[in-house]
């Protein structure tokens, strides 16, 4: 219902919204076309696809959940060139491919749920609804919702600020953000994989194993991210050229990518620490870290760095934020974990 209302409001106020976000007369038509297909028409299928996938994974059906996500992603990759180049739909083709792929994922998950009818606790029947768990769901999910909302707000701010330098920086940043998102999505996959392990061991009081799982995940994310950084730094220009052959945008984007990728390892670890706290049921602590990182630091620093340094200052902002937040995140985790250990020792003595 929330997604439906958001999609409707986005459609009604699409013109002032796109103008506020920095769409120029040259790019307004493309932006509006993408917005209508992906957000207005594709918003509900996108949200349903994500929700059904996470519900499957939460019940231990990780393989079909991953298959559903992969199905939508692979279908999107196949449809993109067909619609963009084959049917000459340009930006609208990419948007249609994304919307249709998410709808196909929803159909896939519905079929899976029908097949798992006797092995799943998920039901849409109203008689099973209860307010008993609403508070717990919101408590744990608040940090993720806050991270997504503030992350989108940060992107809106940087697109708005970069639009003051022309369409080329906006295009270059948009491509860099997509490339930069790939290693972060790998980290998100790690998060979804290790959260049940952390949660189960934390609930069982097996803190030694919980810490081992957490630190292993953090180290893995750090090593994988470092490999991506090396790749992006060494091959920034050809990577950008794959997305856009236009020389000026490609060159500017390569410079952006070499800077932006430096923040990826620290961002990955900060993400994992926040999700570790969520898995421990510490939604408040996780939300504090998220708000501090995106709200208190990122957005104000974007504006400040743009004022003091200019266009490149905004690109350096993410690295600065992650450097500041890493010791804060780690300190929050250690404080929370040590508090729980002390509490348990006291209970054992009693």
Residue locations for each model-derived region?
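Alpha-helical transmembrane segments of multipass membrane proteins
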Residues: 8, 16, 51-55, 74-82, ...
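Short runs within selected transmembrane alpha-helices of multi-pass transporters and secretion channels
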Residues: 38-57, 65-76, 94-109, 191, ...
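Conserved Sensor-2/SRH helix of P-loop NTPases
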Residues: 61, 90, 146
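Hydrophobic/aromatic end-of-helix segments at the C-terminal termini of transmembrane alpha-helices
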Residues: 14-17, 79, 153-166, 194, ...
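Residue-level hotspots within pore-lining transmembrane alpha-helices
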Residues: 5, 9, 40, 44-45, ...
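Small-residue-rich hydrophobic transmembrane alpha-helices
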Residues: 1-11, 46-65, 172-230, 234-236, ...
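Transmembrane helical elements of multi-pass membrane transporters/channels
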Residues: 72, 101-105, 109, 113, ...
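Short alpha-helical transmembrane segments in multi-pass integral membrane proteins
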Residues: 1-42, 86-142, 198-263, 305-350
């Amino acid at each position: 219902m929330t997604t439906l209302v958001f999609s409707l409001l986005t459609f009604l106020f699409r013109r002032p919204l796109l103008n506020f976000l920095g769409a120029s007369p040259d790019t307004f038509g493309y932006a509006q076309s993408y917005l209508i297909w992906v957000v207005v028409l594709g918003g509900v299928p996108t949200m349903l696809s994500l929700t059904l996938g996470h519900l499957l994974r939460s019940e231990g059906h990780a393989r079909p959940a991953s298959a559903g996500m992969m199905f939508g992603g692979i279908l999107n990759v196949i449809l993109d060139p067909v619609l963009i180049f084959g049917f000459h739909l340009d930006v609208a083709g990419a948007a249609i491919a994304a919307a249709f792929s998410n709808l196909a994922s929803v159909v896939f998950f519905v079929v899976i749920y029908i097949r798992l009818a006797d092995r799943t606790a998920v039901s849409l029947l109203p008689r099973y609804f209860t307010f008993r768990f609403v508070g717990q769901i919101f408590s744990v999910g608040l940090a993720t919702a806050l991270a997504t909302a503030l992350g989108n707000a940060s992107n809106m701010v940087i697109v708005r600020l970069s639009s003051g330098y022309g369409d080329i920086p906006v295009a270059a940043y948009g491509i860099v953000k997509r490339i930069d998102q790939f290693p972060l999505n790998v980290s998100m996959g790690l998060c979804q994989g290790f959260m049940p392990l952390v949660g189960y061991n934390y609930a069982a009081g097996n803190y030694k194993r919980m810490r081992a799982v957490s630190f292993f995940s953090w180290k893995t994310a750090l090593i994988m991210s470092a490999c991506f950084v090396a790749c992006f730094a060494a091959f920034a220009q050809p990577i950008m050229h794959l997305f856009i052959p236009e020389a000026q945008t490609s060159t500017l984007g390569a410079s952006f990518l070499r800077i932006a990728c430096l923040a990826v390892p620290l961002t990955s670890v900060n993400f994992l620490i926040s999700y570790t706290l969520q898995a421990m049921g510490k939604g408040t602590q996780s939300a504090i870290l998220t708000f501090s990182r995106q709200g208190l630091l990122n957005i104000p620093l974007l504006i400040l760095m743009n004022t003091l340094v200019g266009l490149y200052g905004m690109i350096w902002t993410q690295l600065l934020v992650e450097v500041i937040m890493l010791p804060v995140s780690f300190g929050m985790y250690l404080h929370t974990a040590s508090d729980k250990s002390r509490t348990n020792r006291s209970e054992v003595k009693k």
